[in-house]
Amino acid sequence: MSRFLRPAFRLATTATRASTIRPTPSSLITKAAAVPTTRLLQKRSYAAEATGVKEYTVREALNEALAEELESNPKVFILGEEVAQYNGAYKVTKGLLDRFGEKRVIDTPITEMGFAGLAVGAALAGLQPVCEFMTFNFAMQAIDHIVNSAAKTLYMSGGIQPCNITFRGPNGFAAGVAAQHSQDYAAWYGSIPGLKVVSPWSAEDAKGLLKAAIRDPNPVVVLENELMYGVSFPMSEAAQKDDFVLPFGKAKIERAGKDLTIVSLSRCVGQSLVAAENLKKKYGIEAEVINLRSIKPLDVEAIVKSVKKTHRLLAVESGFPAFGVGAEILALTMEYAFDYLDTPAQRITGADVPTPYAQKLEEMSFPTEQLIEDYAAKMLRV
């Protein structure tokens, strides 16, 4: 067991940004902006040179994961709004109704409280439901079922009554949908005992983490991102097999480096990789980029090991700054690697405001490649 799993008091920090460091409108997080990141990864990926590698979108990877689990386990079923006849709001469940039938792929009324309650009840009865939310913003209607029923039953029953359920759907930034559809709930669910929380970035992340979630006896929250569904990644031959799963609590080093550690999750990983390449081209800086994959459990050992090598830490997330994932990462780094830091650890987050609908204001509400680059350059004094 990791020596980093002991309880600890959490630190609250306030980051003051320099007036010269501001998001650039041209760096708006969009689907188009995600494409260069993918091309960059294809050039540097070991998988791109291997035999049997195929291109998968994140959507296709999720669809394949669901199909494989439905095929292999009769206890697995999917329910949610428009998941069946419409093939899902984002087409993640495309073709599954035709293949597995209406008893395994179930359309529900527009009532998150209702179908989440049905899903939790089914899990307590021994089935393994995959409960899709059209967006995790709507899951607030079902928060009692997730937090009080699914997350707590195993503990309250003394380990007798498991609740094998997967909650999945898009989370975080989604361009042009304003305050009630753009929130990042990683910190919310990550703070709840009894829940496991993952947030995929690449196609391999999406498939491996979703399959692991469905197979896990605990309730798992899978936080996807709407803007990543259509982005393509190389999928290794191993990841294409139906036994491919990724372990929880294990981060992945997407880019090795020696000067700075950038820890990120979900689509911010791609932004961090673009910023890291720009830092190398402009200043010769080699930044190490860590893809968390798993929020709870968190791979503290990977973060600490990297910080001991680079002596600098920058956490990047799209959530609100107060009590967020970045704040937790900084607090843990202070506890376990403080003596190795050459400069105070920093974090980049979404703005502490409800997400504006106006495009120019929206652009300034989330991390951008330029903002990450500026923060890193300031930390390294270049």
Curated annotation (Swiss-Prot):
Locations listed in the record: Mitochondrion
Amino-acid positions noted as binding thiamine diphosphate in the UniProt annotation, renumbered to this chain: E112
Gene Ontology MF terms in the entry: metal ion binding; pyruvate dehydrogenase (acetyl-transferring) activity
EC number: 1.2.4.1
Classification via SMART domains: Transket_pyr (SM00861)
Binding site for K(+): I165, A213, I214, D216, N218
Cellular-component GO terms for this entry: mitochondrion
Cofactor(s) required for function per UniProt: thiamine diphosphate
Pfam families in alphabetical order: Transket_pyr, Transketolase_C
PANTHER family: DEHYDROGENASE RELATED, PYRUVATE DEHYDROGENASE E1 COMPONENT SUBUNIT BETA, MITOCHONDRIAL
Role summary: The 10-megadalton pyruvate dehydrogenase complex contains multiple copies of three enzymatic components: pyruvate dehydrogenase (E1), dihydrolipoamide acetyltransferase (E2) and lipoamide dehydrogenase (E3) and catalyzes the overall oxidative decarboxylation of pyruvate to form acetyl-CoA and CO(2). Within the complex, pyruvate and thiamine pyrophosphate (TPP or vitamin B1) are bound by pyruvate dehydrogenase E1 subunits alpha and beta and pyruvate is decarboxylated leading to the 2-carbon hydrohyethyl bound to TPP.
Protein name: Pyruvate dehydrogenase E1 component subunit beta, mitochondrial
Organism, as annotated: Chaetomium thermophilum (strain DSM 1495 / CBS 144.50 / IMI 039719)
